[in-house]
From Swiss-Prot:
Cellular compartments annotated: Nucleus
Stretches for region Disordered: 333-405
PTM summary: Phosphorylation of Ser-402 of the pSXXF motif by ATM or ATR constitutes a specific recognition motif for the BRCT domain of BRCA1.
Function: Involved in DNA damage response and double-strand break (DSB) repair. Component of the BRCA1-A complex, acting as a central scaffold protein that assembles the various components of the complex and mediates the recruitment of BRCA1. The BRCA1-A complex specifically recognizes 'Lys-63'-linked ubiquitinated histones H2A and H2AX at DNA lesion sites, leading to target the BRCA1-BARD1 heterodimer to sites of DNA damage at DSBs. This complex also possesses deubiquitinase activity that specifically removes 'Lys-63'-linked ubiquitin on histones H2A and H2AX.
Major location (coarse): nucleus
Protein name stated in the entry: BRCA1-A complex subunit Abraxas 1
Organism: Rattus norvegicus
Domain of life of the organism encoding this protein: Eukaryota
One annotated Gene Ontology cellular component of this protein: nucleus
Family: Belongs to the FAM175 family. Abraxas subfamily.
A GO biological process held by the record: positive regulation of DNA repair
Length: 405
């Protein structure tokens, strides 16, 4: 099985020189790293007689070239200034293995500009194995007597920058003689002082938060309230869903009723209903008039057809026909004065009413050919009623009125 790994080696003398130079300046510093890269293949044989080959690339940082001001060989966009870089490197271009930068009171994270500059340096120097050394010193005490230096070696792999193990040696390459390094977070003295001042109000002596029990109780109460509200919301949603179903069902019923009413209206317009009461009345009172029997009238006074109706509707003339109202005279309900009645009788005598009465009786008693039978008796009885209501001129107390149609 074959694998690859990268290891950075930095001597204590070079690291001390870099730190001394940085602490004697008032701003951040940067520069180029010189050295060499070695590749070593290690073959290990396991108990299963299988060979495992591992290639280890060792980047040995031996020297450095400091730049006494920022942006000395690049601009603010991370683009490399070829003329300035060539002037700085002169004859040591082939021994460049990377570049470094000191940042005060900062975290161990590469900025976007540093990433762009690193890729441009790889392209310009034709060295894909170029590394970047980032050193971030910070002050850990208020008296500024203790300093902390964190360092890291970065190399791009698969488009991302990963930390490479860095060994700081003292007198040689032996691991037992190397400096022991420990990564610490960069903390501000002002932040530490503020936390130390107010920590007693929020933390116990063992570092645990105060009022944790009350916070947990409040959290449990909020959860219970939330469960109750969720149940109410679920119930209301079900009620709303039920109401929506009822509304949709009523809408469907309404649509069906409207469709039925529309169909009935169209049917009534196409086949209007005949006014059978009018037809029966015309046959009863005008049996010989063919002009009145020659058309059929609807309930809306419209002509249905111009052919006569020959159907017997079997309606009782007195009880069913609404066009005839039987008149009943009541002397107690409406008494009439004697003088007007006598005057009316005199006028009737002068107008020869008795001479006209036999002619009226003769026309009323003459039955038509279509209504001989059952209607003959009704017509004769009707004429007798009219005759009775008309009466004689000698009757002074009972004067009839004309029949109402």
């Amino acid at each position: 099985m074959e694998g690859e790994s990268t290891l950075g080696v930095l001597s204590g003398f070079v690291l001390g020189a870099l730190t001394f130079q940085h602490l004697n300046t008032d701003s951040d510093t940067e520069g180029l790293l010189l050295g060499e890269m070695k590749g070593e293949a290690k073959n290990s044989i396991t108990d299963s007689q299988m060979d495992s080959v591992k290639v280890v690339y060792t980047i040995d940082i031996q020297k450095y070239i400091p730049c006494y001001r920022l942006f000395s060989f690049y601009n603010s966009l991370g683009e490399v200034n070829e003329h300035a870089l060539k002037k700085i490197l002169s004859n040591v271009k082939k021994t460049v293995v990377g570049w470094y930068k000191f940042r005060r009171h900062s975290d161990q994270i590469m900025t976007f500009r540093e990433q762009l500059l690193h890729r441009n340096l790889q392209t310009h120097l034709s060295s894909p194995e170029l590394v970047f050394l980032l050193l971030t010193p910070s002050i850990t005490t208020e008296s500024c007597c203790t300093h902390c230096l964190e360092h890291g070696l970065y190399k791009p792999q698969s488009g991302l920058f990963h930390k490479v193990p860095l060994v700081v040696t003292n007198l040689g390459m032996s691991d037992q003689l190397g400096y022991k390094t420990e990564s610490v977070s960069c903390t501000s003295t002002v932040f530490s002082r503020a936390v130390r001042t107010y920590s007693s109000q929020f933390f116990n002596e063992d570092g645990s938060l105060k009022e944790v029990r009350k916070i947990n109780e409040m959290y449990a109460a909020i959860q219970e309230e939330l469960k109750t509200i969720c149940q109410k919301v679920e119930q209301s949603e079900r009620e709303v869903e039920k109401l929506l179903m009822d509304v949709n069902r009523l809408k469907e019923v309404r649509k069906k009723q409207q469709a039925q009413a529309k169909g009935a209206g169209e049917k009534s317009q196409n086949h209007p209903q005949e006014n059978i009461l009018l037809c029966q009345a015309l046959r009863t009172f005008f049996p010989e008039s063919r002009v009145l029997h020659s058309c059929v009238i609807s309930l809306k006074n419209r002509h249905i057809s111009h052919s006569g109706c020959n159907t017997d509707h079997h309606l009782d003339v007195v009880d069913k026909l609404t066009l005839m109202v039987e008149y009943v005279y009541s002397p107690e309900a409406s008494p009439a004065p004697a003088a007007p009645l006598s005057k009316r009788k005199a006028l009737d005598t002068q107008d020869q009413w008795p001479a006209k009465r036999p002619r009226l009786l003769e026309s009323e008693s003459r039955p038509g050919p279509a209504f001989r039978g059952s209607h003959q008796d009704k017509a004769s009885s009707s004429s007798l009623d009219i005759d009775t209501e008309v009466g004689s001129p000698e009757d002074d107390t009972d004067y009839p009125r004309s029949p109402t149609f």
